[in-house]
């Protein structure tokens, strides 16, 4: 596909002042931005240099069901605001391309408010003469049942169209789709052939720029770069780009999705000669590395989404690209929630004084938690180590949760690393802690619930209450199975 360049009907330079548009205070806080501005001013009128704003993993519509409605709505507003900071920056700088590398939405069926919001931002980009390119991600691309190809390969048929397709049909962006996004291939041979994606080529002030978009879906296996052609229309372009959404070997991945088995191998990147640049999403931390003759830039997320996210500041990337290398590559941070973590070894909570009650243990945790809790903080409290059930039940988790709800934006309590010691397996030691002599029992919410429920049922004063407690136990266990 070939798309002619857009002629700007105005005299403003392609790249305005970062200090003017990004703020003098921010420039003073980050000297690298001022250095970047000098580089941009040097190259902004040079033929052969294209400017790009790259963003990914915006996760619009993300819904933390554990939070109250007011905070859920505020969270959605924060996600939209972060994405708008990227589009506003692109418009202010008058860039050539705005590229979105997957997971624009957190769902395949975003609500009308998020859809309308994105439509407005895309309209503004188009009005500014900026070309917008996008690919789907793991969260905003749905799949149906896979069908076998050639006895080994798998092709995925999409049950519902990706939400970005509606914008593409209106001409607001170019959306790279797999063939199965639009229709089922009539036979396996054609389906296999259609896996090789067609590049789109742009003319930017006389410079030919070719782009291919590629993303993985849940259940896909292998290295997605194997589906790229060895030769294509990219052979005749000056600058070749791959817009990618996939796990990359060697990059930290802590996805909540268990069905991600595809991975781009670094050797595949090093051995390919088709792309000078790979602009990627999926990983939530910004990265810029050189692999072979290729520059790999990972945009990172525009907000912290999960507590497993890296500590890096969220943002987007501002790029100046040429055939012979990068002219500038700047990660621009956005306003975001702060991600903070507190690890508490539970052995430190086990009282040496037998008169110590649960209030002292809980207050001990709150005292450690207090400095981290602010209105703009996502805080994870992680309990680790070995303790008895008795000591565990002396921790008032509800009180800690209520404190978190009041003093920080969100609080998560992770006790998956707690191990229970049975009373029979504890031998009193001189320091009063006790030590395990045989085995440790891993904490399980389901088993803990069953044990507590059985205690209550056994202590029930009559048969009617025992039956009621038994029914409640079964309902809770059923709910746990679906969590």
Q: Residue locations for each model-derived region?
A:
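Extreme N-terminal basic, low-complexity initiation segments
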Residues: 2-7
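Glycine-rich phosphate-binding loop signature in dinucleotide/nucleotide-binding domains
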Residues: 92-94, 234-236, 372-374
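His/Asp/Glu-rich metal-coordinating catalytic cores
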Residues: 97, 108-123, 128-307, 311-313, ...
